[in-house]
From Swiss-Prot:
PROSITE patterns: TUBULIN, TUBULIN_B_AUTOREG. This is beta-Tubulin at 65B. GTP binds at residues 70, 137, 141-143, 203, 225. Dimer of alpha and beta chains. A typical microtubule is a hollow water-filled tube with an outer diameter of 25 nm and an inner diameter of 15 nM. Alpha-beta heterodimers associate head-to-tail to form protofilaments running lengthwise along the microtubule wall with the beta-tubulin subunit facing the microtubule plus end conferring a structural polarity. Microtubules usually have 13 protofilaments but different protofilament numbers can be found in some organisms and specialized cells. One of its GO terms (biological process) is microtubule cytoskeleton organization. Keywords: Cytoplasm, Cytoskeleton, GTP-binding, Magnesium, Metal-binding, Microtubule, Nucleotide-binding. Pfam families: Tubulin, Tubulin_C. Its cofactor is Mg(2+).
């Protein structure tokens, strides 16, 4: 079995992680509160060990480590479910205070050894580890600083395994902390050089989905976390269930990442409509294919029309014709040929799993590697440069042991990744500038083929 170890870090990472375990535990027939199996299909158990540890008595535990520099968030999760192993809660004694420096140098560093010890124990309990899944925000101190520290250690200790990050990126219209641009900036080197797959999310796009698509009058973080969890469930479907394509993290990496540094991906999901709208929807594969390319269905505020797609993938769930899916996806590429780079052949992939998500007959998850993401990076760079020119709030970081040169180095790294994506739109080699790729491997795993080109409302948390 090709297992994945999850690390959910900081307040946002643990909230998203908890929603993810809610969603996939139900899909696998595991009761979230007790961890007991109550499913009805052997398919629910066939590949359950990818994300769950199983006992002889059919008791299941999430293969995850819950990490925060303060204990309050993860203590609530410990009390809410027996799905989590008590020994896998790692908490410090003091919050990182929305400060990358405290997450990286002081408060986060104080619990790093315990995090790595728990990780080692989880890794030793699996048969064949394929990689790590890290859930975090880069706007706060723990999610940015401690995650960067953890990633550096994981790459050093497990160089043959992939790191997959689900990252909540600060949005200027949703900012709650004045130093978020600094924290996001300082996270850049670790994400560029140590992550293999980085799925970019932002709260502004997610709240717009809640308000515009789902017509929720009082949307909260529980709603947006649920949308993220649905999308993560879609991305991991082919890892967790048998289907047309039994993919692994490495296959996703090989198919989606043309150069090691260009691994920042935009996820999307369809359908994202209200229950009433679903009643009037035809519910066709054609509709799903159209919707996953709409900016309104992306979990990051990116306009695909403002860049070119290097690679794209659609992961479909439900009973449908593989031939129809392939034809429709190929048709999208042919009709929008100018929105795809011409130097990567067969750069649109499909995968199908017969098992639909809860409450839907069919769904589709989008993954896009687009040069339009440079607009997001430029936004982060501009915000941090504006503050750094004035040396605004810099003393909060230098007081924790950081130097101003570290900010300048991070800005250079961020500018380099912007340049890499910009040049890739013209087909220039974007693989070498600005840094290495710790623990990277560009080839498929031995023995694996490259992936083939190819009632209850889901959005309510009650």
């Amino acid at each position: 079995m090709r297992e994945i170890v999850t690390l959910q870090i900081g307040g946002a990472g643990n909230a998203i992680g908890d929603s993810f375990w809610h969603v996939i535990s139900h899909e696998h027939g595991v009761d979230y509160a007790s961890g007991r199996f109550g499913g009805t299909s052997p398919l629910q158990l066939e590949r359950i060990n990818v994300f769950f540890n199983a006992t002889a008595s059919k008791r299941f535990y999430a293969r995850t480590i819950l990490i925060d520099t303060e204990a309050s968030t993860i203590q609530r999760l410990n009390a809410s479910s027996q799905l989590y192993r008590p020994e896998n809660f790692v908490a410090g004694s003091e919050s990182a205070g929305n400060n990358f420096a405290r997450g990286y140098h002081t408060d986060g560093a104080a619990i790093l050894d315990q995090v790595l010890e728990n990780t080692r124990r989880e890794v030793e309990s699996v048969d064949s580890l394929q990689g790590f899944q890290l859930l975090h925000s880069i706007g706060g101190g723990t999610g940015s600083g401690l995650t960067s520290l953890i990633m550096e250690a994981l790459v050093e200790q497990y160089p043959d395994n992939l790191l997959c990050n689900y990252v909540t990126i600060p949005s200027p219209n949703m900012s709650q902390v004045v130093v978020e641009p600094y924290n996001a900036l300082l996270s850049t080197p670790a994400l560029v050089n140590n992550s293999h797959l980085t799925f970019c999310l932002d709260n502004e796009a997610l709240f717009q989905i809640c308000n515009r698509n789902l017509k929720l009058k009082m949307s909260g973080y529980e709603h947006i976390n649920h949308i993220v969890a649905l999308t993560m469930s879609g991305i991991t479907t082919c890892l967790r269930f048998p289907g047309q394509l039994n993919a692994g993290l490495r296959k996703i990496y090989v198919n989606m990442v043309p150069f090691p540094r260009l691994h920042f991906l935009i996820p999307g999901f369809a359908p994202l409509v209200t229950c009433k709208q679903q009643q009037f929807s035809k519910g066709t594969v054609s509709e799903l294919v159209q919707q996953i390319f709409y900016s309104n269905n992306l979990l990051c505020a990116i306009d695909l029309r403002k860049g070119k797609l290097l690679t794209a993938a659609g992961i479909f769930r439900g009973r449908m014709s593989p031939r129809e899916v392939d034809q429709l996806m190929t048709g999208v590429r042919n009709k929008n040929i100018n929105n795809f780079v011409d130097w990567i052949p067969n750069n649109i992939k499909t995968a199908i799993c017969d098992i639909p998500p809860r409450g839907l007959k069919m769904s589709a998850t989008f993954i896009g590697n687009t040069t339009a993401i440079q607009t997001l990076f430029q936004r982060l760079l501009d915000a941090s440069m504006s503050m750094l020119r004035r040396k605004a709030h810099l003393h909060w970081y230098t007081g924790e042991g950081m130097e101003e040169q570290e900010f300048q180095d991070a800005q250079q790294e961020l500018q380099a990744i912007i340049d890499d994506y910009r040049s890739s739109a013209e087909g220039e080699d974007s693989g070498g500038g600005g840094g290495g790729g710790g623990g990277r491997s560009g080839s498929a795993e031995s023995g694996e083929e490259e992936a083939t080109p190819e009632a209850h409302c889901q959005y309510c948390t009650e």
